[in-house]
Amino acid sequence: MMQDLRLILIIVGAIAIIALLVHGFWTSRKERSSMFRDRPLKRMKSKRDDDSYDEDVEDDEGVGEVRVHRVNHAPANAQEHEAARPSPQHQYQPPYASAQPRQPVQQPPEAQVPPQHAPRPAQPVQQPVQQPAYQPQPEQPLQQPVSPQVASAPQPVHSAPQPAQQAFQPAEPVAAPQPEPVAEPAPVMDKPKRKEAVIIMNVAAHHGSELNGELLLNSIQQAGFIFGDMNIYHRHLSPDGSGPALFSLANMVKPGTFDPEMKDFTTPGVTIFMQVPSYGDELQNFKLMLQSAQHIADEVGGVVLDDQRRMMTPQKLREYQDIIREVKDANA
């Protein structure tokens, strides 16, 4: 029991101490905030007092100045000296708008040229302060400069539109450029498909040499060619010479014919050609024609050339195949 009671007292004491600390912190912060709140009010109040004091001083000086101008009829030199006295007063610019009516003081030097009317230009300065009703005379010189300004103002206004019209008149005859008619592009005509073609290959000897006739004859016969019409060789559908001719072989030298007894015969090369369309599948016939040309070139030691007698390339072979397809589509 004693231990529990002691523990309770310790807890209660700790809570009380914390509460006192919190209360003290809160009161000190509250007093500090109240001090900061009072400072701006005091500053504003002191500033207003100073401003009101300055206004009273200025009003007193203005009243005294009016009394001096009424009583004193001194010469023009003395009056000019007195009229120059307010200038240091206007060097100070108070923060309030109540001192703005004293700005017209700059106008009196213009009206002080005649000596008799010297005191009058100083009076309009004091009219907005004390006696605007008792001195109507300064109002007349103010109205006189206003009337010429109003009359002179419309003159540039009426003359302004004239140059504008003159500048606008030369622009009237200018006609807007008309868009030129755009020529429509001519319709692109599709290239007419060819309905027939001739595929040509050449088997030629190397540069500066010729093919042997006996060796050439044996290679031609091994490739399935048979001597026939027009004294040239033909490759038929069947190797024994039966069936329609698929492609033919002629001499590269004019007139292009051969002699079956050409043991002592030599030539720079031979030409293999195929007419499209032909019997059967033209693409298969083209492959057989290419194989025959390669076989003859290998046997005689020559090379395969295209229709321009240039080295045969894969691009040229694809071109031949495209021509064959085009002819087939045109005749389909």
UniProtKB/Swiss-Prot annotation:
GO biological process: division septum assembly; FtsZ-dependent cytokinesis
SUPFAM superfamilies membership: Cell-division protein ZipA, C-terminal domain
Membrane-crossing segments per the record: 7-27
GO CC term (a single one): cell division site
Subcellular location: Cell inner membrane
Keyword Cell membrane assigned: yes
Ranges per topology, Cytoplasmic: 28-332
A Pfam match: ZipA_C
Function: Essential cell division protein that stabilizes the FtsZ protofilaments by cross-linking them and that serves as a cytoplasmic membrane anchor for the Z ring. Also required for the recruitment to the septal ring of downstream cell division proteins.
Family: Belongs to the ZipA family.
Protein name: Cell division protein ZipA
Taxonomic classification: Bacteria, Pseudomonadati, Pseudomonadota, Gammaproteobacteria, Enterobacterales
